[in-house]
Amino acid sequence: QISDLDDNTQKSAFHVLANIPKRLISQSIILQPKLPIVPPASPKVLKNLREAGILAMPIAQNTNAIYVNASYAGQNFDDKKIMLLEPIAEQLVWLNLARTKVTDNGIASLTKYGLLTRLHLENTVITDKSSIHLSKLSNLEYLNLYGTRISDESLPNLQKLGKLNKLFLWQTKVTPQGAESLKKYFVDSQIYNALIAQKKD
């Protein structure tokens, strides 16, 4: 519960909840994400994460699946702190590492989190070396690589993510030609068209 969080983490959680668009709230029943059935995480582990300034909370009511947001920790969250997430590998489904200090070495450890469906890595220093590890996250549906050093070299690995339906490549080193080559790997043409439009901006 949010009331169990420390003051700073509570503020972050309330900010997230307060800024959910009303339209999304009204459609929440229709748009309930499909979540895996997993055992509950240890309250002690969740407390340790909160004390480290990492927001960790259930994705929805009546589920043990967890959303972790480390972006509030910013540059204070590095590769070593990814190890703090290991005790919740069975529950971690959504992970936000945007604007943190994680590197390719840290991304290598994410292969332990096979249930991940959403992963934010925008504005981190990761490079093409990370893509081979990302390709092993077979349940990924959403991947944000905005503002990273990812290039066309990563595309063969990203193409292996068969469940991926949203991929953000703004301000990366991926070329328009590289983005174009992704077309046949994405069934949803609207997502593909959005990707190409983003690359042209």
Residue ranges and their predicted role:
Residues Q1-T117, N123, K129-H133, E153, ...:
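N-terminal capping/linker segments that flank leucine-rich repeat
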